[in-house]
Amino acid sequence: MTTAVLDRRHLLAAGGLIMVAKASGLLLPARAEGFAPTESMAGGSNNYRKGAAIMDRIGKGGFWMSGTVRRAGNGAPLAGQRIQIWAHTVEGQEQEPQSHGATLTDENGAFRLEMPQIIPIFGQPHGHLAYDSGEFKTVFLRPVMRSAKETSLEAHFVLQPA
């Protein structure tokens, strides 16, 4: 039978080992590195039309779609990325070409595009956004508004290389 010896020398040695392990990060819980990539949302690609034109505004405007685009892992802002936006609005249904447009992110990875007021379809006022330029994996989003009276909606992308 083995007997454990817990004298002062053994306790100090064990305490020292624990302190070294803790300082080196060996006792920290596992964590995700940085920013996890955005997954496509169900219904995000509904009525998608490849190649919507880059524009300053869709239709007569009055509603703002905005957000950011970052790199998975380190969260660095991604400038010059094309984001396509479409929705069911007061000026047209989401499958109609005039309801689609695209914009580019600025140097901070931010985008903003004015469009007509989004109105409910199938009970939920929502927008559609897509990153589909090829350098990173394609992502489709379908954010839902809390109320049809809101005049803006945000969506954020974290992209991973294709």
Feature-to-residue mapping (PLM):
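Domain-scale detector for complete catalytic domains at protein termini or as standalone homologs
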Residues: 15-18, 22-28, 131, 139
